[in-house]
Regions:
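S-adenosylmethionine
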Residues: 1-444
Length: 444
């Protein structure tokens, strides 16, 4: 994708990725539609698509706007479809439907001028043979849908999770709770920071808010890498919920700790900051490079090991072990709204089996008298509470830790002794990622 002029945000590219004829199009809209198509048709994840050379070639401001358009559209697909349905005799191809969805969301949801958006999307539709026959439909349907839904948008039902996820969550939590989660997903996620020093001081410097657990939540995100303290490594981005597993270990200086599935390194940095002797384990050498970069920026130290905990050839045991197991990541939808569209629920059974194996392997690394924290960023009980129950029934030398981590609310505790965190918690503060966390102590 050619780099657009930085003063206009427009370029002569086509939706198909090559110029068919010289059209002046809004590059962010073109790129956002490509992303939506990749997610909806090929089940690609947003994190994958923003690593392409086409996306990286965009100017920084266009990359930011592209992601804003794509993520906002993904959060409001249901609302957009409700607005469009009365004006469509039948659903068009998804590539056409995504142009319509983006148009409705940008005009009604983001407040962009209808005339400019519709005209540009008609031009985008005309730029490739696949969608060109639908330019008249795009023009007519968008104008009608935008006019009809204006003033009703905020009253429209929020985006529902797909059945493969919604059904088990409704069974576990009830429909009211699931609807509260969906509302939290629609609102998106602020940026949370874990800071290396006084949270209040950094909250003031960054115009943020100190959360009950000590994280700093930014009120105005902007470009993260240009904020004070980033280059100096004084803080790192980490959702508040994701900071609890490491802090619950309550590490002391000099203690040994193993961080299993360590990338991208937020928990490793928390542990290193405590003065513990940290060994970070991850199966991916590429992801471990990210951990090394983060440690270098923050001037913290850890021993990085690329290996699978299931067959790691090392007989050491540790004072503490943290396993953040690979999972469905369904607790992160508020910041990754592509997940309900990019995933279809397949593979979760295999993940659950892997999690059980990894939990048993991690437990073998805990010294007598040590402690183990197990967590997943999943909303599905089979990836959290069920594992804890099964493990505690089988491993009689481990018992649930009854302490309450800083900022955690007692009512979040689940029956087996862990904590079930949900995206609708702290709603007045902006929510949190969904997580399951349990600490278990090994007998001496």
């Amino acid at each position: 994708m050619p780099r657009p002029p930085q003063d206009s945000g427009r370029t002569g590219i086509s939706l198909a990725g090559k110029t068919e004829k010289r059209l002046v199009l809004n590059v962010a809209r073109v790129a956002a539609i490509r992303i939506l198509n990749g997610i909806m048709t090929d089940q690609k994840q947003l994190s994958e698509m923003v690593q392409t050379e086409d996306f990286k070639a965009l100017a920084p401001e266009d990359r930011a706007r592209t992601q804003r358009l794509a993520t906002h559209t993904l959060r409001h697909v249901g609302r957009a479809d409700r607005a469009l349905r009365p004006h469509l005799t039948k659903l068009p191809a998804v590539e056409v439907l995504n142009i319509l969805r983006l148009g409705v969301v940008e005009v009604v949801g983001l407040g962009a001028p209808a005339h400019a958006v519709v005209n540009d999307l008609v031009s985008i539709c005309s730029s490739t043979g696949q969608t060109r026959p639908y330019k008249g439909l795009i023009n007519a349907v968008l104008r009608k849908a935008v006019a009809d839904v204006s003033g009703k948008w905020d009253k429209s039902p929020v985006q529902m999770m797909p059945k493969w996820l919604r059904n088990p969550l409704r069974e576990a939590y009830g429909n009211g709770t699931v609807m509260a989660m969906e509302t939290a997903h629609m609102r998106g996620a602020p940026v949370d920071l874990t800071v290396s020093a006084d949270p209040q001081e950094w909250a003031e410097k960054l115009s943020g808010t100190v959360l009950p657990n000590g994280s700093v939540r930014l009120n105005d995100m902007g470009q993260i890498s240009v904020l004070p303290g980033f280059e100096d490594g004084k803080w790192w981005v980490q959702d508040a919920a994701a900071s609890w597993p490491a802090s619950w270990l309550a590490l002391q200086a000099g203690e040994t700790v193993l961080d299993v599935c360590a990338a991208p390194g937020g928990k490793t940095m928390q542990m290193a900051l405590s003065g513990a002797v940290v060994t970070s384990l991850d199966i991916s050498s590429k992801r471990m490079e990210r951990v090394a970069e983060n440690l270098s920026r923050t001037k913290l130290e850890a021993d990085l090991v690329v290996a699978n905990v299931l067959d790691w050839q090392d007989d050491r045991q540790f004072d503490a072990v943290l396993l953040d197991a690979p999972c469905s990541a369904t607790g992160t939808i508020r910041r990754h709204p592509d997940l309900p569209f990019a995933k279809d629920g397949t593979g979760i059974t295999e993940l659950i089996g892997l999690q059980a194996e990894m939990l048993a392997a991690a437990a073998r690394r805990v010294k007598p008298g040590g402690r183990l924290v197990f967590c997943t960023c999943s909303l599905i009980p089979d990836e959290g509470e069920v594992h804890a129950e099964n493990f505690l029934n089988a491993q009689k030398d481990f018992v649930v830790d009854t302490s309450v981590p800083e900022g955690m609310q007692a009512e979040w505790r689940s029956d087996e002794g862990g904590y079930r965190l949900r995206p609708d918690y702290w709603g007045e503060l902006g929510g949190m990622d969904g997580f399951y966390i349990i600490r278990m102590n090994r007998a001496s």
